[in-house]
UniProtKB/Swiss-Prot annotation:
Homodimer. Binds to DNA and alters its conformation. May be involved in regulation of gene expression, nucleoid organization and DNA protection. It is found in: Cytoplasm, Nucleoid. One of its GO terms (molecular function) is DNA binding. InterPro entries: YbaB-like_sf (IPR036894), YbaB/EbfC (IPR004401). Transmembrane segments: none annotated. This is Nucleoid-associated protein HPG27_32. Pfam families: YbaB_DNA_bd. HAMAP family: DNA_YbaB_EbfC. The keyword DNA-binding applies. Belongs to the YbaB/EbfC family. Keywords: Cytoplasm, DNA-binding. It comes from Helicobacter pylori (strain G27). One of its GO terms (cellular component) is bacterial nucleoid.
């Protein structure tokens, strides 16, 4: 077995780790906003999936059921956007290393 190539593998792994850290830092600043109820509810997530903003139209304060439905819809859409973005970043990162 030729162990001389392990140094190259170690360097490749270090490069992947560094790129992943950079992408995660950049992703943290990415904002995904979803709206429901014609914009009556708006939620924003950062790229890490943390809820960073929530807006609810005052007219919904009287209608708890509608507010719950709109909140669930907006939150689910926002979560899906974050997950889709994560998948795209992972595929892009793997694609970059496949070129090496």
């Amino acid at each position: 077995m030729d162990f001389s190539q392990l140094g190259g593998l170690s360097g490749l792994l270090d490069g992947m780790k560094k790129e992943f850290s950079q992408l995660e830092e950049k992703n943290k600043d990415t904002i995904h906003t979803s709206k429901s109820g014609g914009g009556m509810v708006s939620v924003s997530f950062n790229g890490l999936g943390e809820l960073v903003d929530l807006q609810i139209d005052d007219s919904l304060l009287e209608d708890k059921e509608a507010m719950q439905i709109y909140l669930m819809s907006a939150l689910n859409d926002g979560y899906k956007a974050v997950e889709e973005n994560r998948k795209n970043l992972a595929f892009n990162m793997l694609g970059n290393f496949a070129k090496l």
